[in-house]
Curated annotation (Swiss-Prot):
<keyword id="KW-0694">RNA-binding</keyword>
<dbReference type="InterPro" id="IPR049946">
    <property type="entry name" value="RIBOSOMAL_L20_CS"/>
</dbReference>
<dbReference type="GO" id="GO:0005840">
    <property type="term" value="C:ribosome"/>
</dbReference>
<dbReference type="GO" id="GO:0006412">
    <property type="term" value="P:translation"/>
</dbReference>
<comment type="function">
    <text>Binds directly to 23S ribosomal RNA and is necessary for the in vitro assembly process of the 50S ribosomal subunit. It is not involved in the protein synthesizing functions of that subunit.</text>
</comment>
<dbReference type="GO" id="GO:1990904">
    <property type="term" value="C:ribonucleoprotein complex"/>
</dbReference>
<dbReference type="Pfam" id="PF00453">
    <property type="entry name" value="Ribosomal_L20"/>
</dbReference>
<dbReference type="InterPro" id="IPR005813">
    <property type="entry name" value="Ribosomal_bL20"/>
</dbReference>
<dbReference type="GO" id="GO:0000027">
    <property type="term" value="P:ribosomal large subunit assembly"/>
</dbReference>
<dbReference type="GO" id="GO:0003735">
    <property type="term" value="F:structural constituent of ribosome"/>
</dbReference>
<dbReference type="GO" id="GO:0019843">
    <property type="term" value="F:rRNA binding"/>
</dbReference>
<protein>
    <recommendedName>
        <fullName>Large ribosomal subunit protein bL20</fullName>
    </recommendedName>
</protein>
<keyword id="KW-0699">rRNA-binding</keyword>
<comment type="similarity">
    <text>Belongs to the bacterial ribosomal protein bL20 family.</text>
</comment>
<keyword id="KW-0689">Ribosomal protein</keyword>
<dbReference type="InterPro" id="IPR035566">
    <property type="entry name" value="Ribosomal_protein_bL20_C"/>
</dbReference>
<keyword id="KW-0687">Ribonucleoprotein</keyword>
Amino acid sequence: MTRAKSGKISKNRHKKILKFAKGYRGRANSCFRVAIEKVEKALQYAYRDRRNRKRDFRGLWIQRINAAVREHGLVYSQFMGALKKTEIDIDRKVLAELAVNNSDGFVSIVEKAKAHI
């Protein structure tokens, strides 16, 4: 039986890592030993930041809603409490979108919420 070597497999693995490391600075884009460390760290950052993105966007939506509501004499917490009382089930993403792009629709929602404070 002939000896099974992993020449093609390791070559493909190295190519895959180096392709992923394209654009990195210094030896990180050409030297496999350096590149694999950088790629693994980049994947860890990507994993972490996919979760943080959700947190960041929620904060952004809250800031936008708060700014838009304050123009009408309310505070974010009062507005959200009033929305719950009126049983208007619109999430923060849509409310922020309305506040930025469709101010007439947002004003009507604010007026309905003001009636229940």
